[in-house]
């Protein structure tokens, strides 16, 4: 991923935490000259002295399921909030429009997880995303025969993370006046993603004076994506 130094996430642990908190990304591979990709929920397991492990599953007919048998190197692209920035928002002249965003790329070799571990994967995945639900769903709520049928319909895949790239493009290269102008405008937008980007920008330079006409809860937004 092309990443100018100003936007690079310097600490891999922060980029990994961002991806883990998101828990949803685009898994990308290549079958010869044809790219293949599937959006998937996933779990990240950090292991002492070993590469982090990403686990996810796809439907058995998904071409990625067969491709995983070849144990190639794949890439998981994990995106957070993003927002358009108009050139009219800057205080400095001769600016151009841009897009601000946060993204992390994880890459490494993949392998198919043995079928006997499918239920443990589903249990861990659902436990992660059922947090906060009053009556959380578990695999125990499915009849055993039906659950076996469903598990046979998926293929669990793991990726050992060998490379972590993080890019948070938040106008870090702009002067304070432009930083404040853009962040303040994004706060006023109705789009929650724009407000999240504004909160990230404020967190980068909290000492500056921002306009927050919408009364956006910046602290909560800034904490929602693991800066």
Model-assigned labels for residue ranges:
Residues 20-21, 69, 76, 123-131:
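Short, intrinsically disordered, mixed-charge
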Residues 60-121:
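Short, structured beta-strand-loop surface elements
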Residues 16, 94-95, 146-149:
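A generic local secondary-structure boundary/capping motif
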Residues 23, 38, 50-54, 70-74, ...:
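A generic structural signal for short beta-strands and their flanking turns/coil linkers
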Residues 2-26:
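Short, basic/aromatic recognition patches
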């Amino acid at each position: 991923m092309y990443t100018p130094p100003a936007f690079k996430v310097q600490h891999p642990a922060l980029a990994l935490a961002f991806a883990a908190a998101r828990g949803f990304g685009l898994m990308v591979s290549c079958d010869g000259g044809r790219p293949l990709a599937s959006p998937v929920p996933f779990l990240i397991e950090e292991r002492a002295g070993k590469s982090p492990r990403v686990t996810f599953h796809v439907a058995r007919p998904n071409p990625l399921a067969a491709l995983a048998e070849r144990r190639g190197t794949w890439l998981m692209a994990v995106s957070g909030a993003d927002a358009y920035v108009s050139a009219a928002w800057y205080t400095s002249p001769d600016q151009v429009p841009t897009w601000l965003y946060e993204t992390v790329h994880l890459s490494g070799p993949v392998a198919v997880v043995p079928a006997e571990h499918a239920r443990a994967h589903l249990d861990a995945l659902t436990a992660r995303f059922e947090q906060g639900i009053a009556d959380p769903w578990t695999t125990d709520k499915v009849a055993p025969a039906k659950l076996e049928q469903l598990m046979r319909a998926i293929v669990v895949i793991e990726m050992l993370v060998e490379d972590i790239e993080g890019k948070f493009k938040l106008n870090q290269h702009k002067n304070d006046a432009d930083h404040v102008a853009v962040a303040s405008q994004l706060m006023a937008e109705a789009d929650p993603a724009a407000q999240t980007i504004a909160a990230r920008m404020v967190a980068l330079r909290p000492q500056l004076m921002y306009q927050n006409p919408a009364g956006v809860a910046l602290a909560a937004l800034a904490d929602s994506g693991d800066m």
